[in-house]
Amino acid sequence: MRKLSEHAAQHRRGYFTGVIAVTLGLMLLAAAGTIFPGAPLLQPLTIDTDPENMLSEDAPVRVDHDRLKKVFGLDEYVVVGVVNDSHEEGVFNPQDLANIHQLTEAAKGLKFTITVDGEKRQARVVSEDIIAPGEVDNIETSGVGAVDFSYLMPSVPETQDGAIQVRERAQSIPMYQGTLVSGDGKALALYFPITHKKISHAVEQELRQEIAQFEDTGADYHITGLPVAEDRFGAEMFFQMGVSAPLAMLCVFLLLLYFFRNVKLILFSIAAAMIAVVFTMSLLVVSGFTVHIMSSMIPIFIIPIAILDDIHILSDFHDRYTPDRPRLEIIREVMGELWRPMLFTSLTTTAGFASLMLTPNPPVQVFGAFVAIGVLAAWFVTVTLRPAYLMIVSEETLAKFGAARKSKGDGADRPHGALAGGLRAMGGFAGQHGKLVLAGSAVVLALSVWGITKIEVNDNPIRWFESSHEIRVADRVINDHFAGSYMAYLQLQPKDGADAPDQPFKQPEMLRWIAGLQRHLEQNVPQVGKASALPDIIKTVHRELLGSADAFRIPDSPQAVAQTILTYENSHDPDNVWNFTTTDYDQANLWLQLNSGDNKDMESVVQAVDAYMADNPPPMAMQKTWFGLTYINLIWQEKMVNGMAQALLGSFAVVLVLVTVLFRSPSWGLLAMVPLTVTVVTIYGIVGWVGKDYDMPTAVLSSLSLGLAVDYAIHFLARSRQIFARTQSWAKTLPEIYEEPARAITRNIIVLGVGFLPLLASSLVPYQTVGTLISAILVLAGLATLLILPALVGQFPNHLFKKETLNESRTQAPAGGAAAGAGRRR
C-alpha cells in the first residue's frame, strides 16, 4: 500500500481521472436504466420495502402464504377507521354515513399499473370484497325457515333514526361486531382489499384526496394496515435519506473544519466518502439488485468508515507537516506508519459486513455484500487520492496547517490544547490505575451481560414511524376502537392418514371445536381482538332460520349445517363462505384480528393456539399452518436474529485470525478484540436495560461495532508496537501513544459520533436508531480502546513486547511483527 500511495502521489492526474471516470460511468449507467426502463442490458432503480422479501421466495412460510391466500380467496387490506367524537351518535349520522358511502364508491374504481418482476401488471381495489356498510349483508329472519338478505345500508339514510337503524343492524350480527362497527357503537371501520401490496400507498393517497373534499362533520379518518405502513415507509425513505444524510455530512464537515481549520483539505474527506457511496449504490443498481430498507442505509454505514481512514492520514500529516520538508517525504512517513493498520482495519471491517451474506435474509445479504464493497472502495479512494490531493494543494492552502508550526517552546512536537491535555491525562490515568480501569470494565461487562438477558427480539413495521406520525396515530385509534388492524390466519386440515370423514368441516363436532378455539382466543389472549371462522356464518344463519336467539349455535347434524350454508348462498356475497373453508370442506381458515403487530405478540398467539390444541385435542387429528403478513414478519425476524448471531460469531473469528496475522501474535490478536467485545456487549446490554426492542437496525449495527472497534484497536496497538521498538520502555511509550495516535482516534470519535446525531431528526425510527447507536458505538469503542487497552498492556508489557525488545547484540530495532518497523521513517 505504501508503494500504491506513493505511486498515486506521483501520478495523481491518472488516479483522479480513473476514479472519477469509473464512478461517473457507473452513475450514468444506473441513471440510464432508470430513465429508460426496458433498455437492453440496463437495470432500473427498483425500490422494495416489502418485509416479505426479507425471506427468499422459496421460503416455506412465503410459499404457504401465497398458496393459502389463493385457496381461500384472500387479499391484503387497507383499513380506514372513521371516528366522530363530536357527535353523540358517533359516525352514525346521515352526513357521515353519506361521506362513508362516497368514499366506498370512490375506492371501487381505483386501478393502477405496477411493475412486478419487470412486467407491467394491473392492480386494483377488489370492489366485490369491500367490507363497508353498503357492501355487506344484513341477515334477518322473514319467518321460520326463511332468511332475508338485504344490504346493511341499502341507501344513505336521510334521518338520524335511519342512521341508528344501520348501527342496530350491524350490532345484531356477530360477524360485524368489532370488525365493521366498534364496541361502543360509534365508529366504523372500512376494509378495502387490494390485489397487490404495491398499490397500498397509492390507494391511501387517493382515499385521502377524496376525504379532503368532505364537509367537516367532526369525523376523523384514520388509514393504516401493514401494507400501508410498508409502502408508506418506502415513499418516505428516500426523502428522509435526502435530508438526514446531507445533514450528517454537514455536521461532519463543520467538526472537521473545527479540528483542521482548512476548508480545502477537509472537502476532500467529504468528497472521498461521497465517491465511495455513489460508486457502491450505482453498482448495486447496475447489478440489478433492489433497494430495500436495508440497502437504503448503505450510505449511512459507508460514510463513517470512509472518513475514518482519511482522518488518520490527515491527523498524521497535520502533526508532521512543515513547509521546509518535501511533501512527498512526509507522505511516505505517514503512509509508512499507517498502511498496515489501515489495510487490516479495512479488511476486518469488510469481513464483518461480508459475513452478513451468511444470513438467510436476502436483503441483509445484499446489504452486507455492498457495504463490504463500499468499504474497500473507500479504502482505495483514501489511500490513493488523499496522498495525491495533498501533493497538489498550494502552499497558501497549507500556510496555517501543521501542528508543529502552531506549538512553541520545548513542546514543539506536542500540540497544546484542551483535547491534547485531556488525552495525556487519560493516558496517565490508564497507565497508573490500570487495575482500577480493568475492575471497572469487568463490572460494566457483568451488568451488560445481565442487560443482554433482558433483550426482547421484536419488530413491527408500523413502529418504523414516530409515535406522532399519522400512520402510528391511525394504528392506535383503530386498535383502540376495533378488534384489530393486524391480520393473521390459521389454516386447519386433517392430517394425512387421519381417520377423517368426508367434508370434515361440515361435521358439527369439528365446527364446535373451532368455535371453542375462537372463544378461547378472544377471551384469554389479549392480543386477539376477534377470531372469525365458518361457525360464525353457520350460527348466525341458523339463528335467523329458526327465528330464535337460542338458536345461535351449531346445528346438530351435517345436513342442518349444509342447509345453513345453502341458505347463505342466497346472500349478495355468497363467496364469503369460501374465505373460511374450501368447496369440498376439507380445509378451514380462522381469520384473527390482532390489536398489535409486534412479533412477540404474534408469537404469544401462536403459543396460545398450540397450548389450546394440546389441552383440547380436535375431534380428528389436525395439522395447522399459519399465514398472513403479521406471521411472516415474525418468521423473518427470527431468521434474521439467528442469522445475525451466526454471522457475528463467524466474522468475530475471521477478524481474530486477521489481526493475529497482522500482529503475528495470538496474544496481540486477542488484545485487539477486547474493544470489540466490550463495545458489542455494552451496547446490547444497554439495549436490554432501557427496554429497546432488538429489531432490524439494532441487529445490523453489530457489524458496524466490529468494524469501528477493531479499527481503533489496530491503530492503537500497531502504533504502540512501533513506538516501543524505538523507546524500549512501556513507560516512555505510553505518553507518546497519547499524542498523535490518540488525537487521531479521538477526532474520529468526535467527528463521527456527533456527526451522525442529525439522523435523530428523521421521522423514521430505523434512522433514529442508526444515528443513536452509531454515536454510542463510536464513543464506547473509543473509550474501550483508550482506557482498557493501555490498562491491559500495562499488566503484561514484558510478555507482549518480547519481539520488540532489543537484545544487547542488536544495533537496530527489528521488524518485530507486522506493525513494528512499518513506521520507520525514511
Task: Give a label for each model feature.
Residues 95-181, 194-195, 200-203, 212, ...:
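Alpha-helical transmembrane helix bundles of large polytopic membrane transport and channel proteins
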Residues 1-46, 387-388, 396, 404-460, ...:
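Signature of alpha-helical transmembrane segments and their immediate interfacial
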Residues 421-558:
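Juxtamembrane segments of multi-pass membrane proteins
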Residues 70, 151-263, 274, 515, ...:
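Extracytoplasmic
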Residues 265-313, 666-718, 757, 787, ...:
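Hydrophobic transmembrane alpha-helices and their membrane-interface caps
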Residues 241, 270, 322-359, 673, ...:
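Pore- and gate-forming transmembrane helices of large, multi-pass membrane proteins
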Residues 286, 303-315, 339-358, 363-410, ...:
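Transmembrane alpha-helices and their membrane-interface boundaries in multi-pass membrane transporters
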Residues 238-289, 358-362, 646-691, 761-765:
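Interfacial segments of transmembrane alpha-helices in multi-pass membrane proteins
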